[in-house]
């Protein structure tokens, strides 16, 4: 092996980079962040699944003389692969210092950024699209964003910012109506009498896009690419070598010398294997520049040959061109491939992954290989021994040795034949979400008929994601040859394929019965498609399928979302410089979009800084018998291993354990940490820590197991009104049931991050941390280090999303990090990778709800007895408070005169669940709405009618005896029903359902009464500190944390109004325990409420001090008044304080005033469900939210939309999977699916309804959490659709539709002849792969 390296040459943002010692194992993300210090490109998942690290890569093709720009996830791009390429990061697009690019400006001004962590990736995806298509269509914009995740905004404003570049995007966004969206047909409601606005930004402010001003591709790289004397390059690393051949013969010689070396082109298979499966390769071969791998040959009349180096995106373009050039009958395989190429992964991965790599790696989940095999494709391979063709068929995909490439062989190209006149080819798939998700089951099928007949001449069926490899139903196909394509053939085919493809009951991936059902459901779809095609070929000979079956043919479409946001216009008499009530851009919006907003891990490396990684328990409940750290300590770069023995103070604080000692109580509990000079060294050393255990019984994983063992974290909480037992004796009907609601992962884009810096004096320590509760971090670090809190400073500028997940968890992790910093005496950077973040920090509490409801024939509920149990995990965390909130909020919007509610948090051997947006309300109210739906079914009424009958209608007392006025609730409910055209659309859906057997539409409207703040008054207080400087500028600090919700922006608006100065005068640096001590958490939707009051108080104090000077010089300027005040020795600094809402709750008396006010709302959602697959599409959502007076409508609407989409994900596609032994499987974006841009409503309308709330700052309301529950309107719309399907099939319309309503849950509820056909296994004979923990 060569001992020296060649120089790696590439460009980054127009600047030449010459790397003399390139490291083959280093990726581009690490390189730009840690070597080039370009921190705008973010680390979020590390596996190419989230898009936060998106960059643009540009390459020159010397054959075509063209420059190709494409998006790529930097975390998967080996830096050595970039020789001769140009990389553009977000810093290269534009900056505040240089020039803001129109993409960055519009993303910020359209309010497409909240926490800002995903924003650079969004910018790069749109920017790359514009470099290739300066005037994109709306569909291209949606497609370009398909690989980017955002947890804050709900995507709508991001898409809207992109659509401003599209000439097809009109001002009015109502589609197909032929009239303006503001022409409301259904009467005038109270809100329409108010002056309502619909524009959150001014398009006239946007600078135009000028493609001619974009940076040119470096001419030097063109010369390099065209150099006829190129030579082989070798990059030598510490453990590995990277070789780039420049000729085909050179490649074949290398493959002969290193037959096991992987060919790295896109790195989308090799890279994840190294990161997640600990695969190691001493040699990499990268044949990126070989023209033989880049060919496209359409000269062969039998088909097309596509070079193995072509990316999947290039393949898509090639196939699309062919479908335009060739007759439709010849391109059926191409069309099937194109359908899957639209949804396979995201655009970044499609532009990186290559055809050759995808085919040869043969993933079991491949969406393309089954179609290629069904279309009789072949692979052209070559070695030093010569060329040959390998059929891309079942034996190849099943990895049979005789059908596979030899180790020394290289795939040159793939030949895709044209389809025959009497051949039909189709690809089918179903995934947890429409795009960027591995298929749960996919298939490639083709059939060829004897000419002019429906007699099967040849048949191929291949299925993915049902076995360790793609499998071919070859025996089934053989038996069906010669048969007629009719219903009997279908019935036999289903039986045969189920016998041939057996999914074991304990198969990896679970969902066994569902996957069995999908196999034959997809086969049925194929059968219908072929029937329809035959009918088109000869309508006289081949009858068409029944009209009611036609909708089963097509997948649910991907549409570009659009909508309207309505809010109250600002009073025209309000002073121009007063920003309150205006839709002002997030104060860091531009910095988010340029990547200049700094997060913790963006901070420069400190001298002697160490990186920290964790070693966690692999057992749910066990005694630790030994910990051997010797091998880890000996690893290069390791400074120390930290254990419980190193904690100088409390290792168990308030029930939270920092380092496990003697015993572990969950999988994922931190046992020790490794501190090393680099993250790579720390991570590798952590793998070498050896821990032995003795299991302890029982290991309690589920709620039911906890109930069986009487294992609880808290005492029972209860409220009761009326006489429940008596009422049950005097009702017409009683129903009982239970609902399981699974948990939810926060999936904030920035994982938990801490930088702990020990000081040289007085045992002081400074922590930079992403948190919602700096005081809590300070408390835990103080306890762990055994020093007073005044020695611990916690500083927090911003964090990349939180949603409750950064209330308590940063305190525990901060203590862990601080102990390491204390022991080593060096700064410690502690950044959890996504896998460990999901494993350690847990999320929303799973819940089991049991109900008994008594009601009258007319639907009036007279009595309810409800029990709630949550899975709290292994330590207290916030579980007791969550169960209190669940019990208090459990009535939602309904007055039930005899009501009993009890709740208890279960103790299990799972990582401790914690705060999450809505804090128990989203789980509890699903149970409420479920029993409302059950009552409706029993009474043969619409659920909306039952909701109306039982809703609070006048000033009333809650079950805990707090008085409130439901008028805003009634208003939101009525406007939602009216303006969503619910009853007309419901009727239209019923008509659709009559005419379509396999697809059903459903609608639901849910009301909401959501309480704000905390029942303990001391948690509602706040403080602020305001300084006025002599130039008139104002520095503002307060105790709240900027999480993306725009809290700092609102505080600047408050200060601007109170001091009567332009908002540009006010600056806000960070939140710190030094400037504002003892601050409470930023949660409970009360950040702006309480901190706004504190800022207001401080500003009013300052203005009062200035009043004598202002009176003497009323026409003077602000700066003059400030200067005069200083000269008169008037203090220009003031603290502000808000005592807090005086809330209380007496649990012994079961009464109190626990909440200062309520937020009301209603949402109507319409879905379409595919009963054959379980897929659903959200067609439209209308939200009416009681906003009172919005301080900033843009921010508040952003919170409502973002919460709704997060809630929709919680109730539909987000699914945490655990093994029976308590191991979390869902540890990254590949395994846990949050909504993408394709999941949001096709039509999305949000109206902010005006009301009064004099108790709060400017009569506003906290809207951060309320929208979460409204996402359940999607769940109950699905329930409505499934109920219709079940009724049509003669099944009961009362059934448990648990949450989340995943495709599996939906499909298995839509029972039919196919679900009846699948074999069932005896549960006592196997251990399932995964279990539910609710």
Swiss-Prot record:
It catalyses: an aldehyde + O2 + H2O = a carboxylate + H2O2 + H(+); retinal + O2 + H2O = retinoate + H2O2 + H(+). Its cofactor is [2Fe-2S] cluster; FAD; Mo-molybdopterin. One of its GO terms (biological process) is xenobiotic metabolic process. [2Fe-2S] cluster 1 binds at residues 45, 50, 53, 75. It is found in: Cytoplasm. Binds 2 [2Fe-2S] clusters per subunit. Binds 1 FAD per subunit. Its main location: cytoplasm. Keywords: 2Fe-2S, Cytoplasm, FAD, Flavoprotein, Iron, Iron-sulfur, Metal-binding, Molybdenum, Oxidoreductase. Its EC number is 1.2.3.1, 1.17.3.-. GO terms for molecular function: 2 iron, 2 sulfur cluster binding; aldehyde oxidase activity; FAD binding; flavin adenine dinucleotide binding; iron ion binding; molybdopterin cofactor binding; NAD binding; protein homodimerization activity. Gene3D superfamilies: 3.10.20.30, 3.30.465.10, [2Fe-2S]-binding domain, Aldehyde oxidase/xanthine dehydrogenase, a/b hammerhead, Aldehyde oxidase/xanthine dehydrogenase, molybdopterin binding domain, CO dehydrogenase flavoprotein, C-terminal domain, Uridine Diphospho-n-acetylenolpyruvylglucosamine Reductase, domain 2. [2Fe-2S] cluster 2 binds at residues 115, 118, 150, 152. GO terms for cellular component: cytosol. Mo-molybdopterin binds at residues 114, 152, 802-803, 1043, 1084-1087, 1199, 1263. Residues 6-93 form the 2Fe-2S ferredoxin-type domain. InterPro entries: 2Fe-2S-bd, 2Fe-2S-bd_dom_sf, 2Fe-2S_ferredoxin-like_sf, 2Fe-2S_ferredoxin-type, 2Fe2S_fd_BS, Ald_Oxase/Xan_DH_a/b, Ald_Oxase/Xan_DH_a/b_sf, Ald_Oxase/xanthine_DH-like. Residues 235-421 form the FAD-binding PCMH-type domain. The active site is at residue 1265. It holds the Pfam family Ald_Xan_dh_C. Belongs to the xanthine dehydrogenase family. Homodimer. AOX genes evolved from a xanthine oxidoreductase ancestral precursor via a series of gene duplication and suppression/deletion events. Different animal species contain a different complement of AOX genes encoding an equivalent number of AOX isoenzymes. In mammals, the two extremes are represented by certain rodents such as mice and rats, which are endowed with 4 AOX genes, and by humans, whose genome is characterized by a single active gene. Aldehyde oxidase able to catalyze the oxidation of retinaldehyde into retinoate. Acts as a negative modulator of the epidermal trophism. May be able to oxidize a wide variety of aldehydes into their corresponding carboxylates and to hydroxylate azaheterocycles. NCBIfam families: mam_aldehyde_ox (TIGR02969). This is Aldehyde oxidase 4.
């Amino acid at each position: 092996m060569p001992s020296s390296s060649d120089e790696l040459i590439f460009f980054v943002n127009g600047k030449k980079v010459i790397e003399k010692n390139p490291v083959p194992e280093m990726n581009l993300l690490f390189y730009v962040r840690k070597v080039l210090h370009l921190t705008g490109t973010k680390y979020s998942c590390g596996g190419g699944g989230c898009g936060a690290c998106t960059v643009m890569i540009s390459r020159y093709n010397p054959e075509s003389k063209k420059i190709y720009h494409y998006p790529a996830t930097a975390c998967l791009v080996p830096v050595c692969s970039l020789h001769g390429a140009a990389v553009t990061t977000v810093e290269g697009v534009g900056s505040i210092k240089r020039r803001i690019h129109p993409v960055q400006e519009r993303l910020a001004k359209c309010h497409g950024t909240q926490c800002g962590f995903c924003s650079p990736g969004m910018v790069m995806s749109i920017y790359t699209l514009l470099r290739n298509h300066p005037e994109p269509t709306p569909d291209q914009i949606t497609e370009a964003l398909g690989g980017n995740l955002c947890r804050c905004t709900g995507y709508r404003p991001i898409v809207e910012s992109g659509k401003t570049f599209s000439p097809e995007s009109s001002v009015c966004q109502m589609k197909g109506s032929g009239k303006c969206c503001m022409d409301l047909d259904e009467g005038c409601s109270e809100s329409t009498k108010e002056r309502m606005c619909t524009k959150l930004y001014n398009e006239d402010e946007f600078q135009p896009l000028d493609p001619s001003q974009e940076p040119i591709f470096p001419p030097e790289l063109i010369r390099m690419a065209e150099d006829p004397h190129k030579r082989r390059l070798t990059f030598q690393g510490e453990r590995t070598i990277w070789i780039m051949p420049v000729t085909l013969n050179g490649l074949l010689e290398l493959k002969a010398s290193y037959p096991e070396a992987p060919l790295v082109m896109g790195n989308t298979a090799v890279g994840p294997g190294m990161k997640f499966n600990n695969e190691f390769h001493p040699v990499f071969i990268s044949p990126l520049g070989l023209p033989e791998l880049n060919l496209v040959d359409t000269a062969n009349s039998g088909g097309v040959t596509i070079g193995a180096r072509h990316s999947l995106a290039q393949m898509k373009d090639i196939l699309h061109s062919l479908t335009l050039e060739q007759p439709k009958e010849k391109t059926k395989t191409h069309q099937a491939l194109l359908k899957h190429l639209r949804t396979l992964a995201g655009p970044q991965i499609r532009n990186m992954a290559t055809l050759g790599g995808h085919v040869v790696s043969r993933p079991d989940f491949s969406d393309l290989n089954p179609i290629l095999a069904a279309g009789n494709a072949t692979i052209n391979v070559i070695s030093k021994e010569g060329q040959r063709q390998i059929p891309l068929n079942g034996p190849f995909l099943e990895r049979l040795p005789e059908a596979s490439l030899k180790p020394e062989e290289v795939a040159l190209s793939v030949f895709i034949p044209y389809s025959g006149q009497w051949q039909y080819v189709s690809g089918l798939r179903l995934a947890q979400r429409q795009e960027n998700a591995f298929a749960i089951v996919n298939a490639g099928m083709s059939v060829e008929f004897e000419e002019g007949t429906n007699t099967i001449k040849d048949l191929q069926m291949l299925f993915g994601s049902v076995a360790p490899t793609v499998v071919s139903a070859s025996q089934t196909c053989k038996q069906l040859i010669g048969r007629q394509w009719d219903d009997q053939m279908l019935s036999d085919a289903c039986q045969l394929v189920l016998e041939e493809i057996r999914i074991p009951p304990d198969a990896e991936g679970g969902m066994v019965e569902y996957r069995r059902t999908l196999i034959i459901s997809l086969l049925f779809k194929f059968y219908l498609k072929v029937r329809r095609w035959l009918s088109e070929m000869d309508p006289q000979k081949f009858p068409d399928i029944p009209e009611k079956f036609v909708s089963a043919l097509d997948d649910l479409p991907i549409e570009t979302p659009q909508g309207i946001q309505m809010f109250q216009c600002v009073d025209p008499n309000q002073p121009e410089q007063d920003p309150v009530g205006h839709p002002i851009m997030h104060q860091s919006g531009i910095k988010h979009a340029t990547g200049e907003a700094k997060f913790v891990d963006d901070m420069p490396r400190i001298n002697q800084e160490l990186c920290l990684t964790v070693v966690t328990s692999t057992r749910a409940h066990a005694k630790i018998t030994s910990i051997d750290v010797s091998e880890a300590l000996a690893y290069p770069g390791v400074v120390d291993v930290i254990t419980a023995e190193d904690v100088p103070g409390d290792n168990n604080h308030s029930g939270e354990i920092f380092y496990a000692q003697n015993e572990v109580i969950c999988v994922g509990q931190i046992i020790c940490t490794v501190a090393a000079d680099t993250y790579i060294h720390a991570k590798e050393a952590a793998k070498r820590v050896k821990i032995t255990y003795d299991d302890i019984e029982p290991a309690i994983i589920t709620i039911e197991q906890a109930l069986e063992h009487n294992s609880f974290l808290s005492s029972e909480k209860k409220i009761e009104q009326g006489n429940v037992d008596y009422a049950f004796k005097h009702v017409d009907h009683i129903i009982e049931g239970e609902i399981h609601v699974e948990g939810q992962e926060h999936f904030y884009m920035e994982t938990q991050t801490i930088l702990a810096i020990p000081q040289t004096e007085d045992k002081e320590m400074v922590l930079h941390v992403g948190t919602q509760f700096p005081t809590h971090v300070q408390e835990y670090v103080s306890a762990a280090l055994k020093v007073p809190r005044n020695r611990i400073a916690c500083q927090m500028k911003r964090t990349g999303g939180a949603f409750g997940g950064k209330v308590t968890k940063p305190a525990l992790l901060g203590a862990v990090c601080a102990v390491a910093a204390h022991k080593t005496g060096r700064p410690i950077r502690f950044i959890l990778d996504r896998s460990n973040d999901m494993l350690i920090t847990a999320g929303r509490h799973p819940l089991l709800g049991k109900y008994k409801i008594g009601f009258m024939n007319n639907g009036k509920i007279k009595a309810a007895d409800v029990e709630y149990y949550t899975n709290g995990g292994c330590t207290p965390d916030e579980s007791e408070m969550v169960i209190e909130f669940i019990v208090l909020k459990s009535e939602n919007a309904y007055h039930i005169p005899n009501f009993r509610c009890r709740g208890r948090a279960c103790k299990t051997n799972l990582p401790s669940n914690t705060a999450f947006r809505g804090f128990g309300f989203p789980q509890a109210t699903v149970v409420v709405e479920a029993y409302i739906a059950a009552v409706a079914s029993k009474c043969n009424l619409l659920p909306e009618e039952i909701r109306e009958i039982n809703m609070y209608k006048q000033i009333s007392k809650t079950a805990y005896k707090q008085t409130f006025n439901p008028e805003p609730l009634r208003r939101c409910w009525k406007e939602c029903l009216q303006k969503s055209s619910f009853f007309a659309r419901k009727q239209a859906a019923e008509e659709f359902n009559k005419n379509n057997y396999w697809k059903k539409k459903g609608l639901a409207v849910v009301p909401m009464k959501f309480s704000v703040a905390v029942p303990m008054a001391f948690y509602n207080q706040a403080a602020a500190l305001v300084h006025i400087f002599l130039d008139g500028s104002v520095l503002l600090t307060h105790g709240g944390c900027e999480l993306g919700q725009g809290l700092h922006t609102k505080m600047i608006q408050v200060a601007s109004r109170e001091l009567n100065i332009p908002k540009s005068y006010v600056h806000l640096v960070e939140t710190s325990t030094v400037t504002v001590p003892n601050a409470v958490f930023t949660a409970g939707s009360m950040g702006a409420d309480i901190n706004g009051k504190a800022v207001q108080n401080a500003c009013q104090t300052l203005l009062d001090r200035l009043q004598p000077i202002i009176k003497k010089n009323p026409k003077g300027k602000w700066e003059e008044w400030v200067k005069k005040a200083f000269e008169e020795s008037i203090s220009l600094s003031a603290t502000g304080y808000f005592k807090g809402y005086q809330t209380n709750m007496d649990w012994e008396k079961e009464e109190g005033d626990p909440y200062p006010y309520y937020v009301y709302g209603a949402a109507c959602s319409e879905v379409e469900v595919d009963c054959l697959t379980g897929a659903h599409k959200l067609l439209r959502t209308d939200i009416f939210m009681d906003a009172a007076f919005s301080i900033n409508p843009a921010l508040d609407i952003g919170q409502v939309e973002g919460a709704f989409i997060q809630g929709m994900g919680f109730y539909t596609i987000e699914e945490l999977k655990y093994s029976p032994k308590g191991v979390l499987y869902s540890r990254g974006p590949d395994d846990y699916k949050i909504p993408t841009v394709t999941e949001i409503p096709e039509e999305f309308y949000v109206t902010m309804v005006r009301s009064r709330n004099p108790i709060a700052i400017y009569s506003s309301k906290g809207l951060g959490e309320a929208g979460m529950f409204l996402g359940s309107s999607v769940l109950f719309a699905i329930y409505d659709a499934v109920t219709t399907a079940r009724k049509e099939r003669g099944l009961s319309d009362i059934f448990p539709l648990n949450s989340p309503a995943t495709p599996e849950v939906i499909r298995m509820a839509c029972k039919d002849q196919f679900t009846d056909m699948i074999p069932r296994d005896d549960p006592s004979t196997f251990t399932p792969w995964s279990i539910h923990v609710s």
